């Protein structure tokens, strides 16, 4: 026994400390504490009791502007402190004009990120898992209100870690400055294509007008060529007639010379001077004879 007792070391009791160590306490919501100090001006804020059920709403001291209407059960309230400045946010019952909220897509994404961070911090601070059941009527009403008013919808499911799933439905409105694409083409390409199409149409119309002008000129040239051929034929015919008349005139002239020579030989030069009178008398006698023959 003595050997066994000598082999085992003796355990000395720990001395009781006169001053107990203070437990280290950490603030679960450092961002809320800073906002409360900024809101109350450094005064002692009121006590805050954590709820056993996770809520999508932020800290109650951040409710600066209360809503005038009471929302149905299950619809999260929208607070101006969580939204970006310059945006337009109305009651879920009142529809929002998409023309007055150009940056709704960015606002929806930022709201979902901010609510996700807030819900994560609350889920860490609350002990245990948080879960709440929403009846089917309230869930349908919440879905209808979120789809009608384009507000971020909050859906919760009973999970192991008790985290909340935040889902946002941003407005289907194009952000300002976005380039609208028509038929897979940018506006500049569309304008260039329209200009090129107009240029091609102008060239085509010019080609058509030039072709019609060539056809008109060709038809006129063919007509003139036909007239030229006709005139050439007529000219050849007239020349032939003139040549024949010239030949006949030459024959008459030669006969006249021969008759004149014969008269000179028969009557002499004096006979030629009396010849026209004699011819007239002879012609008159012939006419008288013809008249008498006709009467008989």
UniProtKB/Swiss-Prot annotation:
UniProt key word DNA-binding: yes
UniProt KW keywords: DNA-binding, Nucleus, Transcription, Transcription regulation
Chain intervals for the UniProt region annotation (Disordered): 1-27, 98-165, 190-223
Compositional bias of kind Low complexity: 145-156
Domain of life: Eukaryota
Region (Basic motif): 198-220
Single Gene Ontology MF annotation: DNA-binding transcription factor activity
Compositionally biased intervals (Basic and acidic residues): 107-117
Main localization category: nucleus
Cellular localization per UniProt: Nucleus
Residues covered by region (Leucine-zipper): 224-245
Quaternary structure and partners: Binds DNA as a dimer.
UniProt record similarity statement: Belongs to the bZIP family.
Described function: Binds to the G-box-like motif (5'-ACGTGGC-3') of the chalcone synthase (CHS) gene promoter. G-box and G-box-like motifs are defined in promoters of certain plant genes which are regulated by such diverse stimuli as light-induction or hormone control.
Name the record gives this protein: Light-inducible protein CPRF3
Source organism: Petroselinum crispum (Parsley)
Organism placement in taxonomy: Eukaryota, Viridiplantae, Streptophyta, Embryophyta, Tracheophyta
